[in-house]
Regions:
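PRPP/pyrophosphate-binding module of the type I phosphoribosyltransferase fold
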Residues: 104-210
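A short coil-to-beta-strand element that immediately follows conserved catalytic motifs
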Residues: 93-105
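Residue-level recognition of the N-termini of beta-strands and the immediately preceding loop/turn
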Residues: 64-66, 97-100, 164-165
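Short, solvent-exposed amphipathic alpha-helices that sit
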Residues: 80-89, 151
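Conserved beta-strand elements of the Class I
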Residues: 66-68, 137
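Hydrophobic alpha-helical packing residues
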Residues: 89-93, 156
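Active-site-facing substrate-recognition patch
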Residues: 1-66, 75, 102-132
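Glycine-rich phosphate-binding loops at beta-strand->alpha-helix junctions
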Residues: 71-81
Length: 211
């Protein structure tokens, strides 16, 4: 877990990107968990982890909090990835749950295609009542550089949020492993990896949250 001022970040597992090869069994398992999550395929145990960490953050004071989801590249992707988790949290907590607080004004390519630094804050629309005077929990699948989280959190704070806290399934790591041949979506893998590692090291050097 990483905490700074009125922000905090928690994650469950570590994610090794698919452009690495030679992963061990644990790394392969966690990679599958993340990729399945992206497709909306996850079990009750994983949803329970999010619920338990929401409880830890709110300390039982659920009424001054709001749970939102970081935006996917389209409404369809948002529903596919987070729809089941949204419904579970609505049924099992008393906190406000908002699937579509944030969205892109114009269609956005997935951030791992365009590069994290190219995300346009002005392209993110925000439903202000979901965050105004609230302690906001932002949920997403992976935190890599923290760019999307930080920019979205900045916008929410400008619109009156009291604090911002991130809950992520996984944190991206870059182990000392060989890389596969470059694919069409990552033309400059080496520089992106160096940038991701540098930013993430500044963000946090702590281990993943206990399961």
């Amino acid at each position: 877990m990483y905490i700074k001022n009125n922000h905090s970040i928690r994650w469950k597992i570590q994610y090794v990107p698919t452009y690495y090869e030679g992963l061990n069994e644990d790394q392969e398992r966690d990679q599958r968990i993340v990729l399945n999550f992206k497709d909306g395929n996850y079990n009750d145990d994983l949803m329970l982890w999010f619920r338990q960490n929401i409880w830890k953050l709110t300390e039982g004071d659920e009424y001054s909090w709001s749970v939102c989801f970081l935006p996917c590249s389209s409404d369809e992707e948002q529903q596919k990835r987070f729809g089941k988790l949204e419904q579970y949290l609505k049924e099992n907590t008393r906190i406000e749950i908002h699937l579509s607080t944030f969205g892109y004004v114009e269609k956005q390519e997935p951030s791992h295609y365009i590069g994290k630094s190219d995300i346009d804050l002005m392209n993110i629309a925000l439903h202000v009542p979901d965050v105004y005077m609230k302690n906001v929990i932002l949920i997403d699948d992976i935190i890599t550089t923290g760019e999307t989280f930080n920019r979205t959190a900045e916008q929410a704070m400008r619109m009156g949020a009291n604090s911002i806290h991130g809950l992520f399934l996984a944190k991206t790591i870059h182990p000392d492993l060989p890389m596969k041949e470059k694919n069409s979506h990552r033309e400059d893998d080496d520089s992106i990896i160096r940038e991701e590692a540098e930013i993430m090291n500044k963000l946090s050097n702590l281990p993943p949250e206990d399961n």
